[in-house]
């Protein structure tokens, strides 16, 4: 006698490559999209106002797009002798590039020494460096200015650059990265006769591209946006950076809003391009250094 088997309930096969969106996922996408739009609004206003006239900016009538765009604002910006925009861009580029390259080199050396070269007071030195992170940077401006002034570096390019070459947090990032670096590669280098400098140059440094790109991006943005220190050191318009030049528009008796927004657009455009091109290195570098939320 045959035994009857109950029918097996079958579910329709879901097409490959299609996933069912959960309500929580949809809500997350909506919230993130709204936040993205919120953060993009200031950039939209900057670039929109840069191509409008003064009456159009001050008008109560809202203008979504600058039609027609007024590119003469760009000419007015660079022809203003009281606000040397070309000089500010040149000085900002020089300061940001030199500080970025120099800070990466110095911080990588310091991090390598703290992670790989043993000596008696290494931990004491490391924790003393970490304590300096608790001191606000603005507190050090007065003694730092006195030091820079005593050696004659006021109104000089080196006065703008050298104090920003040393960064405790950057050295900390490199130290954490080198602590997690496999020792097998260094042992192989020692077998080949490499000393500490050789290990750093030929093994560790070439494998530090991720952390170098992340730190370089952060350093470049910070140097480019620096305002207070260039304002203190650059007492002559010959040494003004782009942020100091933009501040002169706000201290004038009549504010040229189109020129101000055009200058802000020019100042922010390199940062937007660099950040979009290299944003993935921030995550890779911070993750490689062992700092996770």
PLM regions and their residue ranges:
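Short, Lys/Arg-rich, polar N-terminal cytosolic tail immediately upstream
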Residues: 1-21
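A structural signal for multi-pass alpha-helical bundles of membrane permease subunits
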Residues: 25-293
């Amino acid at each position: 006698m045959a035994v009857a088997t109950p029918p097996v309930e079958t579910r329709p096969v879901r097409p490959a490559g299609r996933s069912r969106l959960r309500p929580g996922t949809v809500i997350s996408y909506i919230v993130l999209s709204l936040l993205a739009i919120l953060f993009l609004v200031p950039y939209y206003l900057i670039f929109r106002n840069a191509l409008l006239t003064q009456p159009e900016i001050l008008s109560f009538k809202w203008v979504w797009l600058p039609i027609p765009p007024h590119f003469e604002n760009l000419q007015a910006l660079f022809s203003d002798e009281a606000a040397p925009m070309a000089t500010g861009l040149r000085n900002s580029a020089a300061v940001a590039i030199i500080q970025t390259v120099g800070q990466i080199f110095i911080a990588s050396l310091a991090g390598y020494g703290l992670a790989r070269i043993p000596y008696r007071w290494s931990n004491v030195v490391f924790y003393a460096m970490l304590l300096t992170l608790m001191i606000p940077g603005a507190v050090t401006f007065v003694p730092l200015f006195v030091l820079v002034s005593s050696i004659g570096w006021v109104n000089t390019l080196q006065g703008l650059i050298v104090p920003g070459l040393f960064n405790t947090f950057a050295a900390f990032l490199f130290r954490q990265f080198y602590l997690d670096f496999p020792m097998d590669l260094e042992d192989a280098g020692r077998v080949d006769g490499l000393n500490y400098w050789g290990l750093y140059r030929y093994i560790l440094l070439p494998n530090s591209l991720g952390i170098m790109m992340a730190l370089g991006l952060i350093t470049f943005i910070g140097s480019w946006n620096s305002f207070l220190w260039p304002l203190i050191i650059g007492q002559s318009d010959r040494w003004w950076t782009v942020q100091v030049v933009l501040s002169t528009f706000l201290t004038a008796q009549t504010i040229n809003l189109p020129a101000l927004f055009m200058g802000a657009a020019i100042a922010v455009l390199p940062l937007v391009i660099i950040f979009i091109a290299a944003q993935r290195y921030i995550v890779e570098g911070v993750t490689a250094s062992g700092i996770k939320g």
